[in-house]
Structure formats: C-alpha cells, structure tokens
C-alpha cells in the first residue's frame, strides 16, 4: 500500500509546474520502507541532465507493520517522515538552484497544504481533514481510506444503505453512510467518532 500512497506525490509535481513555471527543474520522490538494519539512508541529489531534484526517503519498516491494512495511518507515518525531510533538503538546495530561491518558502507552504489536503499531515488543529470525504466518490473514498473495518448493509424505504467505518488512528474513527441511488453509492452523511 505504501507504493500506492507514494504515487500521490506525483500530483504535487503537476501542481508545482502549473503554479511556478519559473522552476527549471522537476521534483522526483522515492519512498522506501526498509528494515533499519539495512544501512541504506535517505538522500537527495540533483540530476543535472534530466533537471530533477530527487528526494529518496527511507522509513523504518517497523513503523508500518502494525498498520498493514490502514492506509490513513500509513499516510500519517509517511507525512511525519517526509515533510521535515522535504523542508530540510529543499532548503539545502536554495543556493544551488537559483530558480528555487525566490519561491522556496512558498513551495514549502504549498507542500504542507498539499500534505494536509491529502491526509499526510494533520491540520493546524491537530486533526485530519476528514471532510475531504465530501468531495470523493465512493470508489475514491475506498481508495483513500482503504478497506473499512466495519461494513453493514441495510435497506430503508426500498433504498440500499451501506454503513462504513474506518479506524483512522488510535483516537479517531470515521463513520460514513452511503445510499445506492441510480446504481451509484452516494454519500448521505459522515462523522468523526
């Protein structure tokens, strides 16, 4: 699942390219979950030929083992490692990439906003923005949060109803109800428990 989540960072490059056309390079992201005894370390390098700032982040496998089926927790773990790494390494290239220097702090702020919006980081109140569920189709919700920990089907007034729950973290559960309308599951309501 980590590789599926890591693919989300590709969208950030598209956002940057549109917002900062003056950047004369792209970002490349690689996320690896490895045993800490492997000795492989995180690194960053600039590929001058392809004009890519490559950020290669290693994360300890033991952090992910309890959450094999919990995509939301995996995102949070990745965000916890990635954002400080990104900030530190990109600031280190401020003098080496002249196009980056004038927009560096904006790029960092945009990355933070992107990570909050995509549930890699909690917001300023320390909570995940679970309201993103309102903008997702049923399929996107399942993709975003992974398999629900609870799924029940009922019928009300001739309409099929599906109640779903996801354990987001130790303190948070997301509950959502969908109704089958015109062969499409539509969000009826959701709440943070």
Task: Give the ranges of each region predicted by the language model.
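Residues within mature, well-folded domains
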Residues: 4-9, 14-30, 34-193
């Amino acid at each position: 699942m980590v590789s599926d989540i890591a693919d989300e960072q590709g969208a950030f490059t598209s956002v940057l390219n549109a917002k900062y056309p003056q950047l004369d390079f792209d970002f490349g992201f690689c996320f690896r979950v490895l045993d800490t005894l492997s000795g492989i370390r995180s690194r960053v390098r600039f590929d001058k030929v392809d004009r890519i700032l490559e950020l290669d982040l290693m994360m300890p496998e033991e952090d992910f083992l309890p959450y094999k089926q919990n995509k939301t927790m995996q995102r949070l773990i990745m965000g916890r490692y990635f954002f400080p790494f990104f900030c530190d390494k990109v600031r280190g290239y401020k003098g080496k990439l002249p196009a980056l220097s004038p927009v560096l702090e904006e790029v960092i702020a945009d990355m933070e906003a992107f990570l909050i919006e995509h549930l890699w980081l909690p917001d300023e109140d320390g909570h995940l923005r679970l309201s993103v569920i309102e903008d997702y189709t049923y399929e996107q919700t399942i993709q975003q949060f992974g398999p629900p920990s609870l799924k029940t089907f009922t019928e009300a007034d001739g309409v099929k109803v599906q109640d779903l729950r996801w354990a987001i973290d130790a303190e948070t559960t997301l509950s959502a109800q969908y109704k089958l309308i015109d062969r499409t599951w539509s969000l009826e309501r959701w709440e943070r428990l």
